[in-house]
């Protein structure tokens, strides 16, 4: 019985060490994501914003708490939304081959032309990482 308890204790310590390692890796990823020079927005496959980094907050001219849970579509200029929705549907199902295009954001009171690049995270249903780069 004591041998089994010792094995359980060792397994528990191994699992705890792995959890601590994963937490440290996640924190490192979050810091990298937040401080990346490029603007990144992560959405669910339906386009709802899950996360946005500091550069994206600057480009979109919105606070993070406003962005989280909002459809990315509402930040696209009205006349560009139909095209964005169509591309989002193709990207979300894995059908799109061209995942980079230009669109216009309605950023606060300004309109900003951006090159937008979408990358599927894992499986198409897992989510989409969007890179937004202002066009000069």
Per-region residue spans from a language model:
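PAS/PAS-like sensory domain cap-loop motif
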Residues: 56-67, 78-79
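Terminal output helix/cap of sensory domains in signal transduction proteins
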Residues: 79-105, 117
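Short loop/turn elements at sensory-signaling interfaces that couple input to output
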Residues: 116-135
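Sensory modules in modular signal-transduction proteins
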Residues: 20-59
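Short, low-complexity N-terminal regulatory "tails/caps" that precede and couple sensory modules
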Residues: 1-24, 135-136
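PAS-family sensory domains
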Residues: 50, 99, 106-114
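Solvent-exposed, non-membrane alpha-helical residues enriched in polar/charged side chains
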Residues: 30, 73, 85-89
